[in-house]
Every structure is written in C-alpha cells, then in structure tokens.
From Swiss-Prot:
Organism listed in the record: Methanococcus maripaludis (strain DSM 14266 / JCM 13030 / NBRC 101832 / S2 / LL)
Keyword ATP-binding applies: yes
Binding partners and assembly: Homotetramer. Interacts with SepCysS.
UniProt cross-references to InterPro entries, sorted A to Z: aa-tRNA-synth_II, aa-tRNA-synth_II/BPL/LPL, O-Pseryl-tRNA(Cys)_ligase, Phenylalanyl-tRNA_Synthase, SepRS_C
Keywords: Aminoacyl-tRNA synthetase, ATP-binding, Ligase, Nucleotide-binding, Protein biosynthesis
SUPFAM superfamilies: Class II aaRS and biotin synthetases
Protein name: O-phosphoserine--tRNA(Cys) ligase
Lineage per the UniProt record: Archaea, Methanobacteriati, Methanobacteriota, Methanomada group, Methanococci
Family: Belongs to the class-II aminoacyl-tRNA synthetase family. O-phosphoseryl-tRNA(Cys) synthetase subfamily.
Gene: sepS
E.C. numbers: 6.1.1.27
GO MF annotations in UniProt: ATP binding; phosphoserine-tRNA(Cys) ligase activity; tRNA binding
Length: 537
C-alpha cells in the first residue's frame, strides 16, 4: 500500500523528484509472470452455435416466427409425406428402440437364492412382489428399481444391486426392441405436423422458422457429412405462395451472410413431398471466396402430402445446413474438425507458443531476484570489455539470522576477446511455429539466414527474453540454492548455446509436441562465452 500522505508531502516540496522516485513503488511482475507469458483469457464460442444465432437473427429480421418442431417422428408420417418413396427415405432414419420389461416372478428358487445372501425374505415377500410387478407394468422407473428393492428388503443399495445381478439374470439378457418411432432426418417431417396444427390457430399467411438438430444414418461420416447436423429451415403458408417466395427468401437470408448473386437450379432429386418442378437448389456467389457455392434447397410442398395433413393452402419450405454455412463462413475444410475440434489436433499460433516459453529457474527471495536486474544491467553495459577482463559485483544479504557476503565475478581470461560473446543479446522470438534466437544486429549474419531472421523479428512474436536475461537468472537462482545448502562457492560456464536449457529456458510440452510434429525448429544456437565465479562468505 502506498503511504499517500508522505507521497503528497514529497510532491508538494518537489513534484519532479517525487514523480521520478515514486516509480519504484510500482513493482514489476516477475519475469515468468510478465508479457507475453501472461495473456488475456477469453471465452470461446463454437462456430456452429455462432452460425445458429446469426441465422436466428437473420430470420427474425425478415419477419419469421421461431418454432421448435418435433424431433421424434412416427414412421407413419414419413409414409404420408413421401408416399411410395418412404421406404427409401426410412433407410436413412434412425429408429428408436427400448429394452422390454421382463415378467420377473418371485419363485421359491429365487427366494432361496436371496436368503443364501443372508437376507430374510419372508417378512418382505409381498413388498418385493409389488415392486417387480410395478416395474413390469411401467409404474416404476428402471433407475429406481435397485433403490426400491433395497428399501423393500431393508438392505443397502449395494446388496440390492447384488440381488439384481445374481438372482435376476433376466435383466442382463435383455435386447433392445425397435419401435415405429424415428429421429427426425430432416426438418420437413416436423413442418407438416406444425403447419397442420397451426392452420386453424393462426391467420394466413404465416412465416415460420426452426433451427434444430436432425439425424441421418449415413453409411459413414466424412469431411462433408455427419450423422447428426443442424437444419435452418423455414416454411411460408398462404394463398399465392410459390417458388418465387423461395427465391426471395433465399436471397434475403443469404445476403446477410455476405453472399451476392444467386442462381436457382432445378434439383434432380425430385423428392415426392415437393410439388413437381419446384424443388430448387440455391447457388450463391461469395466475393471473399470468389466461388459459387450450393448453400440451400427450397420447394413447394406437394398438395398430395399437404392434403393428408388437412392443409389446403400452398406451403413453401426452404432449408440449409448450418454446418455447411459455418464451414463457408469460417473457411473450414472438414466438418468433423469444425464440429468436434477436441478430437483433432489443436494448432497453437505464435502468440500461444510465445506464452509457453519461460525461465526454468528463477530465485524466490525478493532481494536475490532484484539483484538479477542489477547483474543484467552491468553485463549489458560491460559486455564489450576487452580481455583479459573481469566484472565484479558485491552484495550483502540477510539470510535468516546470518549475513551473507556475495561476490560475483564475471571474467574472460583469453586475450583478444570481449567479456561476453556476440550472441549474449540475442532475443527469443516465435515465428511461423519456430522458436529462434534473433540477434540485436544482423551485421555479420550469413545471407542465407538473414531474410528468415529479419522476417522473424518483424513478423514474429517477441518473448522479451534475451540470453543475458535468462543466464543472469540462472546465476541468481544458483546463488539462492547455495544459500539454502550452505555452499560457499560455485561456477557457471556457458561457452556455446545449443539448446533452451543451456540458457535456463523451458517450453511447455504442448508447444514442444507441435513443433516436433510440424517439423518446426528450436534454434537458439550462438556463442555467449559466459564465465562466472561466485563466492559466499
């Protein structure tokens, strides 16, 4: 906390001095907690749900009302809608199945088996029979069966489960039996039901839309087909409705997603629930992609199918696949990867990778941590001293009840060199998935590497960590370890850097895995010629 009164008094006496000196009150974050190792965290929406919401708003802007159509459809409705084509259509439908409820009696043999488990049945026989009978009749849910058996016999639920497994094997041998109910394979099967019920409840004309999941029994899933998908469908019912309404709706809807220019091409499929010569494919031009894309289908429902539902006015239906539109909008190549990204490779961008490059060892004690900054500044200032030369830094620390006098000596004994090597100010960058050390100046860099390094510096993400920074933290971290272990001296020698660990750096395994799998590189090679002796008294 700031001592506000002292600061105000200091500022009143000498504002400039107070302004400069109080900067030390703003403590910088530790290096592993500084940018770009910290990054903003945002929630992330799913592209399919984004597209659904955009489609909802687009339909609402066009005056449509939103409805939810039935997901479970009786196969009789498929026959009513498709006529003789129904059998072929039902082949792509999922049928709902359920386990039958076995007629389980409480015979003398089963009573004997229960009693062998140490449970007295005689007092509870009638209660147990009622439970088994209730399950058979459907008045007791299956997920309550174990609990009710346990309560009836006054035993634990674990023992109740054992009875169900050991005494009533009939439950384990059950096989699902298919019903006549199907999961909606396309939105049309629901529209007939909805429009039929609204005919005597809403004035004509009316415009409805629904965006919901459909299920299709594809032979296999591939980059453009899933067994479950979302349909964004609408229906317009009223006198005078025809395919021209479909064209206008297609243009109005899709123009809100960046499409321009539309082609309406007769669909060769000719589904029997559409009036002949009305089933139409919509192709739209996308200026960004510079392509014509098939994006929707519409048609006018057949009077034959409509009449079976008591609908006596034309109904135009338009539908499009949400996933298809999301793929176009997001430039995805594979619907599986777009819908289920968690099952596919996650690509880290350069910013992500940069946040995963950190110092391996950092001192914990504030005094020693602060020494690092002084050490870095001295090294940078004196890096070009001509050898033989040395740089000495002395400090006294309080460690527990003792005083520690520390002398750090950085030296170069060999003649004709500098105190520190030419790569000492190299900085770690992430560029195009690579982790590279880039020099402060490109003087003397070979032409074959120069272009890549220049691009890395201008287009890559800087980590803000230079070799000298990381190495100085290595020195002070070892100093802290020496305090703890009561060591009196140690040396640090790093002549040539070949890997991140040589300069006290590490990278997250997730980033490392991507670098290796994508044939990217970690190249931090360079001469630093660091020689350090530390003595502690």
């Amino acid at each position: 906390m700031f001592k506000r009164e002292e600061i105000i008094e200091m500022a009143n006496k000498d504002f400039e001095k107070a302004w400069i000196e109080t900067k030390d009150l703003i403590k910088a974050k530790k290096i592993n907690e500084s940018y770009p190792r910290i990054k903003p965290v945002f929630g992330k929406t799913h592209p399919v749900n984004d597209t659904i919401e955009n489609l909802r708003q687009a339909y609402l802007r066009m005056g449509f009302e939103e409805y939810i159509n039935p997901v479970i459809v009786d196969e009789r409705d498929i026959y009513k809608q498709f006529g003789p084509e129904a059998m072929a259509v039902l082949d792509r439908c999922f049928y709902l199945a359920g386990l039958p409820r076995p007629d389980v009696g409480l015979s003398d043999e089963k009573i004997s088996q229960i009693e062998k488990l140490g449970i007295k049945v005689s007092e509870h026989k009638e209660s147990l029979q009622k439970i088994l009978h209730g399950y058979k009749k459907g008045t007791l849910d299956g997920d309550d069966l174990v609990l009710e058996i346990s309560n009836a016999l006054e035993i634990s639920s674990e023992m109740g489960l054992k009875i169900l497994e050991d005494v009533f094997p009939e439950f384990k041998d059950l096989t699902a039996v298919s019903s006549k109910l199907t999961l909606r394979s396309h939105m049309t099967s629901g529209w007939f039901l909805t429009v039929s019920d609204l005919m005597n409840k809403k004035p004509l004309p009316f415009k409805l839309f629904s965006i919901d999941r459909c299920f299709r029994r594809e032979q296999k899933e591939d980059k453009s087909h899933l067994m479950t998908y979302h349909s964004a469908s609408c229906a317009i019912a009223g006198e005078g409705v025809d395919i021209n309404d479909g064209k206008a709706i297609a243009e109005g809807l899709l123009s809100q997603f960046g499409f321009t220019n539309f082609k309406f091409i007769p669909d060769e499929k000719k589904s029997k629930y559409y009036t002949p010569e009305t089933q139409t494919e919509v192709y739209a031009y996308h200026p960004k992609l510079k392509e014509w894309l098939e994006v929707a289908t519409f048609g006018v429902y057949s009077p034959v199918a409509l009449s079976k539902y008591g609908i006596d006015v034309p109904v135009m239906n338009l539908g499009l696949g949400v996933e298809r539109l999301a793929m176009i909008s997001g430039n995805f190549a594979d619907v599986r990867e777009m819908v289920y990204p968690q099952f596919y490779e996650h690509k880290l961008n350069d910013r992500n990778v940069a946040s995963m490059v950190k110092l391996d060892k950092v001192p914990v004690m504030d005094e020693i941590y602060d020494l690092t900054k002084e050490l870095i500044e001295s090294c940078v200032k004196n890096k070009d001293l001509k050898s033989p030369c040395e740089l000495a830094i002395e400090k006294t620390f309080s460690f527990g009840k003792t005083k520690k006098n520390v002398k750090i000596n950085i030296f170069e004994k060999e003649e004709g060199k500098n105190l520190l090597g030419p790569s000492i100010l190299n900085e770690i960058y992430v560029y195009d998935g690579n982790v590279i050390g880039i020099p402060e100046s490109f003087d003397g860099v070979k032409e074959e590497f120069k272009d890549f390094l220049e691009k890395g510096k201008s287009e890559g993400v800087a980590t803000g960590i230079r070799y000298i920074d990381a190495l100085c933290f290595k020195i002070t971290s070892k100093l802290e370890e020496a305090f703890v272990s009561n060591t009196t001296e140690f040396k640090v020698k790093v002549p040539i850097v070949r890997s991140l660990s040589d300069i006290n750096l590490k990278i997250d395994d997730i980033a490392l895995k991507q670098i290796m799998s994508k044939n990217k590189v970690i190249d931090v090679r360079g001469p630093v010629f660091l020689n350090v002796e530390v003595k502690i008294e």
